[in-house]
């Protein structure tokens, strides 16, 4: 029996992980128990086991063929988890690499996951830039508000393509500065 699979996406620094974790906390109180899975963490585990990286941020710099192989292995692992319970997959719709945008959910991953819903968490490029600059825990490439906006546009395009390929609905959720509670409430409602 197929359990519900939801994909939650957003550019680095938008707060998709934080807002979705808080929504999952709300849902647990209601007896709705998703398993939260970070696609990046599963990819990192696989890449680290293969001695390809030592920190998560290095994964963006792997050559595309290696990234594709790691994505496929991670997708297979998560698909196995989804057989046990509903799953929310925290990931990126696209990954900005030195050679261009890499789909975060290429066909071989989509075929494994077959999501029911794809959520894109967004805010303005300026807000994301400020969040990134104040986050000393991560090593991030320097971007401008304009390149962040372009990345978010690519995420929307990719999310709709994923929806076309799988029949999943696509939901855009705004996570503006100072309005986290609103984003969490919207996520909680759509995940019920």
UniProtKB/Swiss-Prot annotation:
It catalyses: AMP + ATP = 2 ADP. GO terms for cellular component: cytoplasm. Gene3D superfamilies: P-loop containing nucleotide triphosphate hydrolases. It is an enzyme of class 2 (transferase). SUPFAM superfamilies: P-loop containing nucleoside triphosphate hydrolases. InterPro entries: Adenylate_kinase_AdkA, P-loop_NTPase. One of its GO terms (molecular function) is adenylate kinase activity. Active from 30 to 40 degrees Celsius. Its EC number is 2.7.4.3. Keywords: ATP-binding, Cytoplasm, Kinase, Nucleotide-binding, Transferase. It is found in: Cytoplasm. ATP binds at residues 10-18. Monomer. Belongs to the archaeal adenylate kinase family. This is Adenylate kinase. It comes from Methanococcus voltae.
